Amino acid sequence: INGHIELGVMGCPNLPRDVSQPKPKDGDIRHSSMEGLGVLFVAARGHGAFVAPINDTEAPLEPIHMRELEGDFTRATFCESVEAGHSSLGTNARIAQILGMGDQHVRMDSQAKYASISRGDGDVYLRLPVGDGSYQEKIWDHASGSLLVAEAGGTVSDLAGRPLNFGLGRVLSANKGVVACQSNMHARVIEAVASALKEEGRSSLLSV
């Protein structure tokens, strides 16, 4: 409504309900290997973020929150794309170094990254433009996930810290890249992003 996402629903059929449970290997479709998989995420602006098993219509929605790190980046982990063509993983690594983060990262594709950090599986999600940065993000790739993170205690913005503008059509034409993390860590992540892009001579990505 007026460029703001009011309701977000995401179904992640291959995401373990318990983060400590290993995901089955590709091609393994035995019933036993699929038990415990499938999570439904729901967020409503001003009302919080919730989760339930995707295959249990009677299960109540349980509230979720981002992991509380109290600004300690040494305990934080990245949640980033598997495919290098989707985000600049090398720049991610440099940002992690600037922030003093370790090298333990969670890698997955799709909007499941938003879902993952919203319940504390990871802490920082960056989607940094590759190449000349001409690619424009599609709104459907970020709408539900951005609200989910916001309602779980996080902040989602572009690389320069601007809110994502969903009111300009099919793409986020007023934004470059995505930064999502806990609200009390967001300003520091934005500073690290700017520093890393400056080192690479790509500071132009901070303007649209």
Task: Give the predicted meaning of each segment.
Residues I1-L7:
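Glycine-rich active-site/cofactor-binding loop and its immediate structural neighborhood
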Residues N14-R17, P24-H47, P53-V208:
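An extended, acidic
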